[in-house]
């Protein structure tokens, strides 16, 4: 539930939907041109999922995380956020939208079995 609530709180605080909020701050910096986010009947983005990216855009996101929040030489997200969001927060090995795996790996799962897996130690 809290993962869904975070998206709604960002929308209410910013006054715009998650895509509009994140496009200038993140998506455009990564070259993600037209992200879409699924919404509920009230127009709230489901912050814990429902983000539609192409496979190449999902790959960019994985590279961005592998580079600890840096893209094209610029720090876009703090290294601390990357570390926090990719560590296992509960018993099922799930962090902030990332699943923890063996060998210090983590992954973001997309619809229809699309996966962006990051193995920082390899």
Regions from the language model: what does each represent?
Residues 14-49:
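Active-site helix/loop module of the DD-peptidase/beta-lactamase fold
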Residues 33-34, 79-122:
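Active-site Gly/Thr loop motif
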């Amino acid at each position: 539930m809290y993962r869904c609530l975070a998206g709604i709180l960002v929308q209410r605080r910013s006054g715009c939907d998650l895509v509009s909020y994140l496009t200038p701050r993140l998506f455009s910096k990564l070259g993600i041109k037209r992200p879409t986010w699924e919404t509920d009947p009230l127009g709230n983005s489901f912050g814990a999922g429902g983000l539609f990216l192409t496979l190449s855009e999902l790959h960019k996101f994985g590279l961005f995380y592998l580079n600890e929040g840096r893209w094209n030489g610029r720090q876009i997200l703090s290294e601390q956020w990357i570390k926090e969001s990719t560590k296992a927060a509960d018993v099922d090995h799930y962090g902030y939208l990332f699943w923890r795996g063996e060998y210090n790996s983590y992954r973001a799962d997309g619809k229809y079995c699309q996966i962006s897996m990051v193995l920082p130690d390899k």
